[in-house]
Amino acid sequence: MASQGTKRSYEQMETGGERQDATEIRASVGRMIGGIGRFYIQMCTELKLSDYEGRLIQNSITIERMVLSAFDERRNKYLEEHPSAGKDPKKTGGPIYRRIDGKWMRELILYDKEEIRRVWRQANNGEDATAGLTHIMIWHSNLNDATYQRTRALVRTGMDPRMCSLMQGSTLPRRSGAAGAAVKGVGTIAMELIRMIKRGINDRNFWRGENGRRTRIAYERMCNILKGKFQTAAQRAMMDQVRESRNPGNAEIEDLIFLARSALILRGSVAHKSCLPACVYGLAVASGHDFEREGYSLVGIDPFKLLQNSQVFSLIRPNENPAHKSQLVWMACHSAAFEDLRVSGFIRGKKVVPRGKLSTRGVQIASNENVEAMDSSTLELRSRYWAIRTRSGGNTNQQKASAGQISVQPTFSVQRNLPFERATVMAAFIGNNEGRTSDMRTEIIRMMESAKPEDLSFQGRGVFELSDEKATNPIVPSFDMNNEGSYFFGDNAEEYDN
């Protein structure tokens, strides 16, 4: 957490390590990725999946979910203490799709969690390899971010649905550790805090007793994580107020909503990492790639290179557009759901269209859908250029943005102006400016008002040719400043339902 003065790179968070040098980090991230790949290969063998079936993204997701479920200790304990009819707490499973006589068939499988834990540990040199599990969680979270809207969740906590660019990582489980916290958006953490405060308001005992003490520690820790994401002194000072409150209530909720809104212009630092489906790592390991020896980085060229020569398939519903399905998965792979479409499109080398214009639903297929009517097609996950992922929000400035999403959260460290609709954002700040945080509020509003549209973020940073592995020749793209940059504009995506 930034507040304790220990800035670790993502890779260190990702691998749970202390400070390491670049080579050690590359090796330990490589070890984690190799472990996921070995696990996937072994599961395909156990399930007798053909090479083609093993490359199907839906099968990859089922296998990933099984291992996450096998290691979800809290839920496993809960299931054993509260047995529900027809559910075996010791088993996990899901749909596996097989190609039989030229048609896709769904088979529901059940596996002992113990057996899956054994396969996972065996693939990871006998260790629990929590970092690898978190990595899978982040891939699922990135896929959810690209696929679903969180309008309902935002409205429920009193936030504005147009603040969706702050909601990265909103479906990540609590147990995702430091690496999970790093990729959560400002809105996601504000929402978790608001939920806690609301429970405290409704339940007298929430902050009391031994349990309450633990709750309080969790509350303060979460406040520190959020504080560490803000880049201005006034925002951080306001977070100190929220954290130190004796009895958090509506005033703190107001402050958190204010801070979340302010992040539309004074952006927080949110980490971005390219987390790929397990089958991609499996394919690479199977073809003889030694991740630990070669080293790997989640924020450099490596994921791009991996996707350049991996063939992954997806089931496609009868009225879906395969190119749109590919865009959805590409965005998820690079954690680019809230990135400016102009930037994503330039890197990908293909037009990237807003969510509302995509003719595709999510990747996962519901149990009541007819699989036999579906075909499979190759996902086009290659890119024209690559760019370094950012862990900062870029500096602030503004420009015309859309009705659906009024700001972006940059993913790639590439020079551009960051679009946001100043009039819309500022309209939310009329009025409430009294109370103990008034001076900080005034300062924050002043900074937001002085943000300029022509300011460039990530100055001088560019994209790189895929042959330029050492990032020596940045190509700084020029963008049409008036073009639409928001993905969730005019949105008709499905809501995320747990």
Curated annotation (Swiss-Prot):
One Gene Ontology term of the molecular function aspect: structural molecule activity
GO CC terms of this entry: helical viral capsid; host cell; host cell nucleus; ribonucleoprotein complex; viral nucleocapsid
Top-level taxonomic group: Viruses
Signal peptide: none
Pfam families listed in its UniProt record: Flu_NP (PF00506)
Motif Bipartite nuclear localization signal mapped to chain: 198-216
InterPro entries reported for this sequence: Flu_NP (IPR002141)
Localization annotation: Virion; Host nucleus
Quaternary structure and interacting proteins, as annotated: Homomultimerizes to form the nucleocapsid. May bind host exportin-1/XPO1. Binds to viral genomic RNA. Protein-RNA contacts are mediated by a combination of electrostatic interactions between positively charged residues and the phosphate backbone and planar interactions between aromatic side chains and bases.
Motif Unconventional nuclear localization signal per UniProt: ranges: 1-18
Gene from which this protein is expressed: NP
Residue ranges, annotated region (Disordered): 1-22
PTM field: Late in virus-infected cells, may be cleaved from a 56-kDa protein to a 53-kDa protein by a cellular caspase. This cleavage might be a marker for the onset of apoptosis in infected cells or have a specific function in virus host interaction.
Assigned protein family: Belongs to the influenza viruses nucleoprotein family.
Name the record gives this protein: Nucleoprotein
UniProt record, GO biological process: symbiont entry into host cell; viral penetration into host nucleus
Compositional bias per record (Basic and acidic residues), positions renumbered to this chain: 8-22
Keywords: Capsid protein, Helical capsid protein, Host nucleus, Host-virus interaction, Ribonucleoprotein, RNA-binding, Viral nucleoprotein, Viral penetration into host nucleus, Virion, Virus entry into host cell
Role played: Encapsidates the negative strand viral RNA, protecting it from nucleases. The encapsidated genomic RNA is termed the ribonucleoprotein (RNP) and serves as template for transcription and replication. The RNP needs to be localized in the host nucleus to start an infectious cycle, but is too large to diffuse through the nuclear pore complex. NP comprises at least 2 nuclear localization signals that are responsible for the active RNP import into the nucleus through cellular importin alpha/beta pathway.
